[in-house]
Regions:
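N-terminal accessory targeting/assembly segments
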Residues: 1-230, 234
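Extended, highly charged alpha-helical segments
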Residues: 233-252
Length: 252
């Protein structure tokens, strides 16, 4: 089930022994620097704690929390395993795992817990000055390129971003033999990118490689952010510098 912060059940889902399918929220935004206001509580067959899929959904959907209740051989509740996203921290930890406990013995004021978490996220957002530049994460996939070439191209991309008035706050790279046709990067690295974008309070993700329309659309939906590639960034710079009507038409 999905439960809101008032304790009301908003969605009921039925899965199988391996997985459940969460609702498709489409482009319903959670708000920058904000969680979605829903926690997912579901059961696992046997003594399995939170899985990689659970943590991926927690990150991609920006849920308040992900809770998995194990079951005994008799079909009774076992332990409740819970995790929540962490704001940016010195340890670099993305997820906080709460101490497993029988469901009836969970000792957590969830409203207070999530209120403190969102206050911490709000404080981080307030460190941005009014009128400050857009903040971005740069992403590069090797796909057979040499490390030296990647480093040089990323340095060049940073300079292009600065020329466009964008503040680069992080860089994510992935080494893989070929790019993913749907997302450019792998699902594991996408999960990491979602969390880092959330923690860094960014507005924009810039890919070093050219994205297909399908890749750009899929990434924007998953990240809930504006996603562009190197070519689009260069066009943005031209557009900013175009003063005449003819110049603007040429950029378009």
């Amino acid at each position: 089930v999905l439960v809101d912060r008032g304790g009301a059940v908003t969605h009921v889902m039925v899965g199988d022994a391996r997985s459940i399918e969460l609702p498709d929220w489409g482009r319903m935004r959670a708000g920058r620097g904000r969680l979605r206001g829903l926690r997912c509580i579901h059961t696992h067959v046997g003594d399995e704690p939170l899985t990689r899929d659970d943590l991926t959904d927690l990150a991609l959907l920006r849920l308040d929390a992900m809770v998995a209740v194990t079951t005994t051989a008799e079909g009774l509740p076992g332990l409740a395993h819970a995790a929540a996203l962490r704001p940016a921290n010195a340890d670099g930890e993305a997820v906080e795992h709460l101490e497993p406990a029988p469901p009836a013995q969970l000792d957590l004021d969830f409203r207070a817990f999530i209120r403190e978490r969102e206050e911490e996220l709000a404080r981080q957002s307030q460190t941005r000055e009014v009128g400050a530049a857009e903040r971005a994460i740069l992403v590069s996939v090797t796909a057979g390129r040499r490390p030296y070439d990647i480093e040089m191209q990323l340095d060049e991309l940073k300079e292009l971003a600065r020329s466009a008035g964008v503040e680069v706050v992080d860089v994510v790279t992935q080494h893989r033999p070929r790019v993913d046709p749907k997302l450019m990067i792998g699902s594991g690295r996408l999960e990491e990118l979602v969390i880092r974008a959330f923690q860094s309070d960014v507005d924009l993700v810039i890919f070093d490689q050219n994205l297909t329309p399908t890749q750009a659309r899929n990434l924007a939906e998953r990240l809930d952010l504006r996603v562009i590639d190197r070519t689009q960034l260069i066009l943005d710079i031209f557009a900013q510098n175009a003063k005449t009507r003819d110049g603007k038409l040429q950029v378009e």
